[in-house]
Amino acid sequence: MAAKSDMTSLSSGLLINELLSNDEGVMGVTNQVFPIVSEPGAKLPYICYRRGSNEDRAVKTLAGADTAVIEVLCYADNYAHSVRMAEAVRKAMDGVSYRYEDEGGQSLVARSIQMTDAEEGWNDDAYMQSLVFTVKINNS
């Protein structure tokens, strides 16, 4: 029997970073993926993501499940590119499951990722697409 992982939905950003950074479609529209904020001097286009909220749900007979809400922001210097980025992110994340494993062998499994909201805007001289995903994490 595998050892219980210490990783919970608080580590979901690590999983999202790996998922987006390893996706060919996403890397085809940008090679810059940042947690929370972009690095100083980052050039458009780029993606930022953050964990917006977290909920733990106990289940009587099974291992519990955490739910994390992840916001992914796609920034580009033109509207069409921002939409292409959003489409690539949605294709990479929506309706998938994903397993992340760190260097120490700890793992985190997103049993389902679902897009729940999206909007667009203008922020810091860039077109922005905001996508919100609900990520259900196995606690095993």
Model-assigned labels for residue ranges:
Residues 56-59, 77-79, 139-140:
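Short, cysteine-centered beta-strand-loop-beta hairpins and adjacent loop/turn segments enriched
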Residues 45, 68, 111-114:
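Short beta-strand or tight-loop elements
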Residues 9, 82, 122-126:
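Short capping loops/turns at secondary-structure boundaries
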Residues 86-94:
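Long, well-ordered alpha-helical scaffolding segments within enzyme catalytic domains
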Residues 94-140:
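Acidic-leaning, charged glycine-interspersed low-complexity segments
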Residues 64-82, 89, 127-137:
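Oligomerization/assembly interface segments of phage tail-like spikes and tubes
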Residues 1-62, 84, 96-107:
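Small/polar-rich, solvent-exposed N-terminal microdomains that initiate assembly or binding
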Residues 34-36, 50, 73, 116, ...:
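Residues in well-ordered beta-strands of folded domains
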